[in-house]
Amino acid sequence: MSRIAVLGSGAWGTAIALALSRRGGHQIFLWSHSQEEASTIAGARENTLFLPGFLLPASIHVTANPNPIAQAEMVVSVVPSEFLRPTIARLQAYFRPGQVVVSATKGIEHASCLRMTQVIASALDVLPPAPTAPNPDTCLEVFTEPDAPEVSSSGIEAAPTFLDRLDLDFGALSGPSFALEVAQGQPTALTVAFQNPAVAARVQQEFASETLRLYTSTDVVGVELGGALKNVIAIAAGVAAGAGLGYNSAAALMTRGIAEITRLAVACGGQRETLAGLSGVGDLVLTCTGSLSRNRTVGQALGQGRKLPEILASLGGKVAEGVLTARAALELARRHQIEMPITEQMELILNEGKDPREAIKDLMLRPGKDER
């Protein structure tokens, strides 16, 4: 029996736990940062706050105790991007050598421009500390080789710490997947990416069921950036819908949106083909058109003239990752000298209060370009 810890008891974390339970043969620990929340879910055997209507089977153990993390062969992180670093730092002592760590959060850390697998590695001291403020000159988009081991005056290497010995595999799970539909058991296909294809194949097998199919990849960069950046384009699609624009506009935004996502992903080391798959075009189409998309919902409300603080408050504690991703994505694009006009206009709407209709007009009046 495999022991799997799911970090984050929101809608997506709960849906992943339910999907894993359908596979059978797993002991699943759904970890919450809040003892009160964990007790409520465990008592009701249902996540009444974030994903009501689904009974949690006996194979899912809901807890706020971090000890089960140390017992797990696989850790699936579904913690929202803005809380990921402090959460992993808090749980650092419970990670152990040989674990497989899967990030299922779609975002980019605002302060560092790091992808989610990089944030986890950084919080575990595998990467250098992140900077405290966004800066295109200090955004880190690649892993850095660790420093050479310290050597004492006697010439003997210093004894390794726990984290020096920590040998973890980091990967990403992404693709078109509304939590509600995954929880309902509707057929869903996702991509799981690890640099080591054998580890990706292992995760694929652990998740596989008649309702969930995983495809493997070694392109962690492309899979993560596709999942994160499409949220910004989904906000743009919502803005267009809220402003009363039609299908022509939506098609243009999605097509040009995947073009700018691909440019940045390739510049960061991703593969163009990845963005044509489930974690790129697939996720983009779903999030830009589906009524269950929180990012599209936020954009639609903005297009109707509502203010961002009011919109976010109406989400009932759920997170629209694109709101936080826009600025970090733009900083990363500036570092790599990549044009991302849609992302730029969304950042101005979200963070500078630009009128959505002015943003749409400015996109249309940009100088003529070749289609690439």
Region spans (language model):
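General beta-strand structural signal in soluble alpha/beta enzymes
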Residues: 103, 169-174, 214-218, 276-277, ...
